[in-house]
Amino acid sequence: MHEYSIACEIFEQVIETAKVHGALEVRHVTLEMGRLSHTNPEQLSFCFKAIAEGSIAENAEFIVETIPPSLECECGYTGTVDETQIGKNDELQSELLEYIAALECPVCGKNARIIGGRELIVKSIEIETEVEQ
């Protein structure tokens, strides 16, 4: 389960940033997770909370915002994947998106290259400092 090692890295970043800013407590951690990151948000959240026990991030709310894959086509189109392109109601097709190298361009119909959606970014950290108490 690679979610544990990812959660460890996120935890280290969060704690380091919180300490630099004099945090007494971490209230919220918000991540942007690409749909193609091959990371399970529920498992990542569970791992983060387990790692954070006994730390200033122990009670932090762990929020994951999903980023859709983005496309680029030789016709000049760039944009995000429309869920209807992959059969939103078909769970298997939706899961297979992680393994697809290209999708049909919504403008010209040719294969468009997937250029984004693999990100995993700590978007924001909300902390409590002594001044706020």
Curated annotation (Swiss-Prot):
Key words of the record: Metal-binding, Nickel, Zinc
Gene3D superfamilies registered for this protein in UniProt: 3.30.2320.80
One Pfam family in the UniProt entry: HypA
UniProt: Ni(2+) binding residues: 2
Signal peptide coordinates: none
Entry-linked InterPro entries: Hydgase_Ni_incorp_HypA/HybF_CS, HypA/HybF
Residues reported to bind Zn(2+): 73, 75, 105, 108
PROSITE patterns: HYPA
Family: Belongs to the HypA/HybF family.
Described function: Involved in the maturation of [NiFe] hydrogenases. Required for nickel insertion into the metal center of the hydrogenase.
PANTHER family: HYDROGENASE MATURATION FACTOR HYPA
Protein name (record): Hydrogenase maturation factor HypA
Organism annotation: Methanosarcina acetivorans (strain ATCC 35395 / DSM 2834 / JCM 12185 / C2A)
Lineage: Archaea, Methanobacteriati, Methanobacteriota, Stenosarchaea group, Methanomicrobia
Gene: hypA
